[in-house]
């Protein structure tokens, strides 16, 4: 059985990046929540 995590910078950015978050209402809520908590990094 292969490992489930096969790292790829491109896929990481597309799925969890700032622009991916910004594109949906839920994603914007995630960013807002992370800003409210004072997170240094908002997204991948």
Swiss-Prot record:
Gene Ontology CC entries for this record: ribonucleoprotein complex; ribosome
Span list, region Disordered: 1-44
Molecular function (Gene Ontology), one example: structural constituent of ribosome
BP GO terms, sorted: translation
UniProt KW keywords: Ribonucleoprotein, Ribosomal protein
Compositionally biased residues, Basic residues: 10-19, 31-44
NCBIfam families registered for this protein in UniProt: rpmH_bact
Similarity comment: family membership: Belongs to the bacterial ribosomal protein bL34 family.
PANTHER family associated with the record: LARGE RIBOSOMAL SUBUNIT PROTEIN BL34M, MITOCHONDRIAL RIBOSOMAL PROTEIN 34 FAMILY MEMBER
Descriptive protein name: Large ribosomal subunit protein bL34
Species annotation: Afipia carboxidovorans (strain ATCC 49405 / DSM 1227 / KCTC 32145 / OM5) (Oligotropha carboxidovorans)
Encoding gene, per UniProt annotation: rpmH
């Amino acid at each position: 059985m292969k490992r489930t995590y096969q790292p790829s910078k491109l896929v990481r950015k597309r799925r969890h990046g700032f622009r991916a978050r910004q594109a949906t209402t839920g994603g914007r809520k995630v960013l807002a929540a992370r800003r409210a908590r004072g997170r240094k990094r908002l997204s991948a």
